[in-house]
Curated annotation (Swiss-Prot):
Protein name (database record): Probable glycine dehydrogenase (decarboxylating) subunit 2
Domain of life per record: Archaea
GO CC annotation terms, alphabetical: cytosol; glycine cleavage complex
Organism: Pyrococcus furiosus (strain ATCC 43587 / DSM 3638 / JCM 8422 / Vc1)
Swiss-Prot/TrEMBL catalytic activity: N(6)-[(R)-lipoyl]-L-lysyl-[glycine-cleavage complex H protein] + glycine + H(+) = N(6)-[(R)-S(8)-aminomethyldihydrolipoyl]-L-lysyl-[glycine-cleavage complex H protein] + CO2
GO molecular function list: glycine binding; glycine dehydrogenase (decarboxylating) activity; pyridoxal phosphate binding
EC class of the enzyme, as a word: oxidoreductase
Gene that this sequence comes from: gcvPB
Keywords: Oxidoreductase, Pyridoxal phosphate
E.C. designation(s): 1.4.4.2
GO biological process terms on file: glycine decarboxylation via glycine cleavage system
Transmembrane segments: none
Family the entry assigns: Belongs to the GcvP family. C-terminal subunit subfamily.
Modification N6-(pyridoxal phosphate)lysine, positions: 273
Function: The glycine cleavage system catalyzes the degradation of glycine. The P protein binds the alpha-amino group of glycine through its pyridoxal phosphate cofactor; CO(2) is released and the remaining methylamine moiety is then transferred to the lipoamide cofactor of the H protein.
């Protein structure tokens, strides 16, 4: 049984002691006098923690022992593709010639960086069947917003301002309707049928002269391939709308079929999912957006282009109908470097194998867990890269909810799946093992879920009160949202006022 380390670890500011140092700045080779305007000078002392290097290393090592990541074990968050991040990615991304260049440098001095961005775009075009990409968006949701803004600009440019409705399936990621709403669209929800795919009759009834487009994930969030995608594309295009591809689940079809060949006009990708760049910590991520030829003039500026005559790469601002910038500078460059490293190492055959093993792992887990008491399997049985089980039978029969199952999994030293999503599945357990998980890990995960099922029906309280073996027990799920304390200064002020007691 798993037992997590537990340290009573203070904040790094609380460990600080005046005069302790972990780094000594080199002496300047000459006196540097900088005339800083008075209004820009600090009025108070810069409050930074003072610790020695050993103290810092021990502090963060202890914190890491109370954490869990993709390097710790299976991390099957559905629709997140938490695959292993190869360490060669980090080696390349932290190379001085990558890490120490500056975005304000003359483009003649960063030809290598521009070449990396240009080459990554060629890979993404080939993988998706798109004709042009922007690498600027910082994450999936930022990419979505970019895509729907392009849709909006396209319709306005064509004299169709009445196209203000964005169609979104009921199984969609929550960011889809949010991005559409931010771009000024009215969101129309399209229901799923009994197979877990889009209801074509409902889709046909929903389209009109007001339809701007349809945002679709394929495979969808149930892990089911939308096998009527060609007909879906025809319906949308006949109505004058555009088809938008949410690339969150590209890992399930990588190297097998391309969104552009299915009829999609715009795609966004999540490099931090499909192409092994790190998740978490608030970023950095990357959400490149690709478009078909007829939409390329709406992409954000600048693009990276190549001049064959001079043999140079350059930042191309000649994008006549551009929606403008969606992020400062040129995107999260180090993330782009990691993704290209992964692509070049894997190659075409390797990428195809990625999706094959991801699909195999998801279906292996599905078949091993299927039929276990308390878990039901909605929709089609054959899945792509992920599967959604429902713990609704368990809840009705024992009172043990999906949340309880997720918390109990932590006691086995395993990360919980995504829960309560998609919303169309009650008590959802959304499991995406990815291709980097071994058969032994899959077997252990299924056995843990079966063990939890047994406990739910024989000793439900042990599940309802879980986790028992982690450093932190059940947290207050809403406290951080209601009372965010995101800086040391905020925490110190609240503590001095007696408003926090920890």
């Amino acid at each position: 049984m798993f037992r997590q380390a537990k340290w009573d670890e203070p904040l790094i500011f609380e460990l600080s002691r005046p005069g302790r140092v972990g780094y000594t700045l080199p002496k300047p080779i000459e006196d540097i006098k900088v005339d800083i305007p008075e209004k820009l000078r600090r009025k108070s002392k810069l409050e930074l923690p003072e610790l020695s290097e050993p103290e810092i290393v021990k502090h963060y090592t202890r914190l890491s022992e109370m954490n869990y990541g993709v390097d710790s074990g299976i991390y099957p968050l559905g629709s997140c593709t938490m695959k292993y991040n190869p360490k060669i990615n980090e080696e390349i991304a932290t190379h001085p010639k990558v890490a120490y260049i500056h975005p304000y440098q003359d483009e003649r001095t960063v030809q290598g960086a521009l070449a990396i961005m240009w080459e990554l775009e060629q890979w993404l075009k080939e993988i998706t069947g798109m004709d042009r990409f922007t690498l600027q968006p910082a994450a999936g949701a930022n990419g979505e917003f970019t895509g729907v803004m392009i849709i909006r600009a396209y319709h306005l440019d064509n004299g169709e301002p009445q196209r203000n409705e964005m169609l979104v399936p009921d199984s969609a990621h929550g960011t889809n309707p949010a991005s559409a709403a931010m771009a000024g669209f009215k969101v129309i929800e399209i229901p799923s049928n009994e197979n877990g795919t889009i209801d074509l009759e409902a889709l046909e009834n929903a389209v009109s002269e007001r339809t701007a487009g349809l945002m679709l994930t394929n495979p969808n969030t149930l892990g089911i391939f939308e096998d009527e995608i060609v007909e879906i594309a025809k319906i949308i295009h006949k109505a004058g709308g555009l088809l938008y591809y949410d690339g969150a689940n590209l890992n399930g079809i990588l190297g097998k079929i391309r969104p552009g060949d299915m009829g999609f006009d715009i795609v966004h990708l999540n490099l931090h999912k499909t192409f092994s760049t790190p998740h978490g910590g608030g970023g950095p991520g990357a959400g490149p957006v690709g478009v078909k030829e007829f939409l390329k003039d709406y992409l954000p500026v600048p693009l990276v282009s190549y001049d064959e005559k001079s043999g140079r790469y350059y930042l191309d601002y000649n994008v006549p109908k551009s929606i403008g910038k969606v992020k400062e500078l040129y995107g999260n460059f180090a993330v782009l470097v990691r993704a290209l490293t992964y692509l070049k190492i894997m190659g075409r055959d390797g990428l195809r194998e990625v999706s094959e093993i991801a699909v195999l792992n998801a279906n292996y887990l599905t078949q091993k867990l299927k039929g276990t008491r308390g878990y039901s399997l909605p929709g089609k049985e054959l899945r792509k890269h992920e599967v959604v089980f429902s713990a609704e039978p368990m809840k009705k029969e024992t009172g043990v909810k999906a949340l309880d199952v997720a918390k109990r999994l932590l006691d086995f030293g395993m990360h919980a799946p995504t829960i309560y999503f998609p919303l169309i599945v009650h008590e959802a357990l959304m499991i995406e093992p990815t291709e980097t998980v071994s058969k032994e890990e899959l077997d252990a995960y299924v056995e843990a879920l079966k063990r939890i099922s047994e406990e739910a029906y024989t000793n439900p309280e042990i599940v309802k009160s879980a986790p028992h073996n982690t450093a932190v027990k059940r947290v207050d799920d809403v406290l951080a949202a209601k009372k965010p304390i995101v800086t040391w200064r905020m925490y110190k002020e609240l503590k001095e006022k007696g408003e926090v007691d920890y």
